[in-house]
């Protein structure tokens, strides 16, 4: 790792040395503390449910990176990576430590991010709340023993004080809430929000800064491996089917959200899963449902007086969650790492109905679509009219990328070349017309296409190039209707298809302009210029 040492300030050392700083508590001990402190409620599934108050999701406007000379020029500053001066940070840091020093109890966890020891970040997590500490134990990688935990000298520390509130006029924040990362001081400082996902995504952002510095790819994707050791990566924004398609009973899960790719292969950054729980059912998503048991943290789920859970109720938020250790899932790789990928799948739910259900990408096209990170969401209007709305998230994870996007795209391109990876763009959205006119592509057909891709059956298939997007479409895929494969054939009026396709192409081009002249060549070779 680029950063491998960290010296605690004397203030942190004194806090951690106090008897009231409870180190590496077991799940049962943390359950007892959570219930004793009225931080959560026990459910009939055995999981703890905690409410996060007014923040039921991430707070991107309150996320900062400290501007320090050693790395100031590396960061892609803007609305996502907002700067805060080091002096402001240190003053706030000091106030938070003084606040925590007065607490009756704190909860401390030592663990890791990264299941490959060659690319591992050692962590200390200091929590004001016991349920946050159990969340950290679930999401990060636990040491095998307490003795191992005590030996950890952290590269990075999370200090979480959700009940401490900043004063924006003094502290330089935008509100009472703050998530501040200092690469110099190796700290993520969190206050004013009880949403536990800030810890998970805070470390992911740190990883996305550190790993590329060592020419290691960090990725917002899921990954699985087949019986023959063939590895597949799945990239996709919310609603594209990433969780559903990567949860394959014939393949073992490496991880569901965050991965690294180094000289050894693919490795999970996390030790757990943070699954969406809204409308969860055992029938639809048995793997996730069955993982919700003793040791799991539920967030903002509706629970009645008898402890019965209603996953369909969005009373508190649509963003209900379940955080559980990955060993709650049966069909996993242990440890969570595997060889270099054979196949990469980019998932998009195209509500315009013009992208092919599956197409094979060249390296340049893969880099272009990786930078674009396209899907389409459905925006309701006051009059009840719904129109597709394009959504572009750079590298399928723009909120968590501290470096310039081209750094990640270049790394991906080099790895595709080096390991001969097949890359496919899979549309899980509409065909035969846009949303409201066309129809959703059958999940069974999508599964069949993905299965053919990741087992290598499409590698040497016959392809035809579509004349709008320049994408290579397979002439046939076993058990998938041929008329479905080329989208123009699914539309009743070819000219209407071309008009809609050109509209989407224009949106891609407009979005790509934000990357500037550095990617002009890529726009020509991989895009629609």
From Swiss-Prot:
The encoding gene: pckA
Subcellular location: Cytoplasm
Keywords: ATP-binding, Cytoplasm, Decarboxylase, Gluconeogenesis, Lyase, Manganese, Metal-binding, Nucleotide-binding
Organism: Staphylococcus saprophyticus subsp. saprophyticus (strain ATCC 15305 / DSM 20229 / NCIMB 8711 / NCTC 7292 / S-41)
Cofactors, names only: Mn(2+)
GO MF annotation terms: ATP binding; metal ion binding; phosphoenolpyruvate carboxykinase (ATP) activity
Name of this protein: Phosphoenolpyruvate carboxykinase (ATP)
Binding site for ATP: 201, 220, 236-244, 285, 321, 440-441, 446
Leading EC class: lyase
Annotated transmembrane regions: none
Family in the record: Belongs to the phosphoenolpyruvate carboxykinase (ATP) family.
């Amino acid at each position: 790792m680029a950063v491998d040492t960290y010296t605690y300030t004397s203030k942190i050392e004194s806090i951690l040395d106090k008897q009231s700083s409870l180190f590496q508590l077991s799940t049962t001990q943390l359950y007892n503390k959570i219930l004793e402190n009225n931080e959560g409620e026990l459910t009939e599934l055995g999981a703890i449910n905690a409410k996060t108050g007014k923040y039921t999701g991430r707070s991107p406007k309150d996320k900062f990176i400290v501007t320090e000379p050693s790395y100031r020029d590396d960061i892609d500053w803007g609305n996502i990576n907002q700067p805060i001066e080091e002096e402001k940070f240190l003053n706030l840091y000091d106030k938070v430590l003084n606040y925590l020093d007065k607490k009756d109890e704190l909860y401390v966890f030592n663990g890791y991010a990264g299941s490959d020891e060659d690319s591992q970040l050692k962590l200390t997590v200091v929590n004001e709340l016991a349920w946050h500490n159990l969340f950290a134990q679930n999401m990060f990688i636990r040491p095998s023993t307490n003795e191992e935990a005590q030996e950890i000298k952290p590269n990075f520390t999370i200090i979480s004080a959700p009940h401490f509130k900043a004063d924006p006029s003094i502290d330089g924040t935008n509100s009472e809430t703050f998530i501040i990362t200092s690469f110099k001081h190796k700290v993520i400082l969190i206050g004013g929000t009880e949403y536990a996902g800030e810890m998970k995504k805070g470390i992911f952002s740190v990883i996305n800064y550190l790993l590329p510095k060592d020419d290691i790819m960090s990725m917002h994707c899921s990954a699985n491996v087949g019986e023959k050791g063939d590895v597949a990566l799945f990239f996709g924004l919310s609603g594209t089917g990433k969780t559903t398609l990567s949860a394959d009973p014939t393949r073992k899960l490496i991880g569901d959200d965050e991965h690294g790719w180094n000289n050894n292969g693919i490795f999970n950054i996390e030790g757990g899963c943070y699954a969406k729980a809204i409308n969860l059912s055992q029938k639809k998503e048995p793997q996730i449902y069955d993982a919700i048991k003793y040791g799991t943290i539920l967030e903002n789920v509706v629970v009645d007086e008898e402890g019965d859970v209603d996953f369909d109720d969005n009373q508190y938020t649509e963003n209900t969650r379940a955080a559980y250790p990955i060993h709650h899932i049966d069909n996993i790789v242990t440890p969570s790492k595997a060889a270099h990928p054979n196949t990469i799948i980019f998932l998009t739910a195209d509500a315009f109905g013009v992208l092919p259900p599956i197409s094979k990408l060249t390296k340049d096209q893969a880099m272009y679509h990786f930078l674009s990170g396209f899907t389409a969401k459905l925006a309701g209007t006051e009059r009840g009219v719904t129109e597709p709305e394009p959504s572009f998230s750079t590298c399928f994870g723009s909120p968590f990328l501290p470096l310039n996007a081209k750094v990640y795209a270049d790394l991906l391109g080099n790895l595709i070349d080096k390991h001969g990876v097949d890359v496919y763009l899979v549309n899980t959205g509409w065909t035969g017309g846009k949303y409201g006119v066309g129809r959703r592509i059958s999940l069974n057909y999508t599964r069949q296409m993905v299965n053919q891709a990741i087992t290598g059956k499409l590698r040497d298939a016959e392809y035809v190039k579509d004349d709008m997007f320049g994408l290579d479409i397979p002439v046939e895929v076993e058990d998938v209707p041929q008329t479905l494969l080329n989208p123009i054939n699914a539309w009743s009026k070819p000219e209407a298809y071309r008009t809609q396709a050109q509209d989407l192409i224009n949106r891609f081009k407009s979005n790509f302009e934000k990357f500037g002249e550095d990617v002009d060549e890529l726009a020509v070779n991989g895009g629609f210029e």
